[in-house]
């Protein structure tokens, strides 16, 4: 479920690892070994699980604790009861081009979700995203956008401005939280596509880590209609976000 909000999102960290029953941990480990055998590029890094969400008139507070990517992926693929589900926390960026196109990425074949459509983003990282003892989700979004699309949110020649705009909350079998910035790019659709294609070629030539295979540009006002024509798997929040964006354009908001 996507919520449109201007509130700042802050974290409260519990410095312990999430405890899982041994029989569930065994299933997760067996599943993970099977996935790595299919795709050696996978890495079982740290993931942060949201245990509680609170808010006041200005802020949203997320209490988090550690788990791992295997736990997250198992939950995504097979589902886990709410008590032990992985409510992972991520930060991302939704981009709008200068000429009014929503930018949605298509994950590369080497990722854990080939062809999946989603915005740029990823999990918070203790090595890079800490400010004053807590996670800064803007830093997460900036880091992921630079790694995945070679775009710098602070570069005025690429991005005009950005704001907190959306937060994804758990819904149905998807247990994730994702804080999503909205960024207005200086680039047009054609310019951003050219920029990305050059970056993708660079990653191929240097054996760099690729997240997205291509970008899809969906004209705001009819973005959901264009999205529905694509047969790719899609993150649940993508359609919900674009419904809000289409409505805003059609109502001149």
Could you describe each region identified by the protein language model?
Residues 1-119, 123-143, 151-253:
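N-terminal leader/linker segments that precede catalytic domains of diphosphate-processing enzymes
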């Amino acid at each position: 479920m996507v919520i449109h909000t201007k509130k700042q999102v802050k974290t409260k960290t519990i410095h312990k690892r999430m405890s899982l029953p041994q029989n569930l941990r065994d299933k997760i480990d067996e599943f993970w070994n099977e996935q790595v055998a299919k795709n050696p590029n996978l890495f079982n890094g740290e993931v942060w699980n949201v245990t509680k969400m609170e808010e006041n008139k200005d802020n949203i507070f997320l209490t988090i604790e550690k788990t791992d990517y295997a736990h997250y992926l198992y939950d995504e693929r097979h589902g886990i009861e709410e008590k032990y589900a992985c409510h992972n926390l991520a930060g991302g960026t939704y981009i709008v081009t200068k000429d009014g196109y929503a930018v949605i990425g298509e994950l590369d074949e080497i990722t854990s979700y080939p062809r999946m459509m989603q915005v740029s983003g990823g999990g918070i990282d203790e090595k890079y995203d800490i400010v004053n003892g807590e996670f800064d989700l803007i830093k997460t979004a900036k880091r992921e956008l630079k790694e995945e699309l070679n775009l710098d949110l602070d570069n005025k020649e690429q991005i005009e401005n950005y704001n907190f705009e959306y937060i994804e909350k758990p819904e149905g079998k998807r247990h994730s939280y994702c804080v999503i910035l909205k960024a207005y790019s200086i680039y047009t659709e054609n310019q951003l596509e050219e920029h990305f294609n050059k970056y993708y070629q660079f990653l191929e030539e240097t054996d760099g880590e690729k997240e997205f295979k291509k970008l899809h540009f969906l004209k705001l006002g009819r973005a959901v209609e264009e999205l529905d024509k694509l047969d790719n798997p899609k993150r649940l929040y993508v359609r919900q976000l674009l419904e809000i964006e289409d409505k805003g354009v059609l109502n001149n908001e």
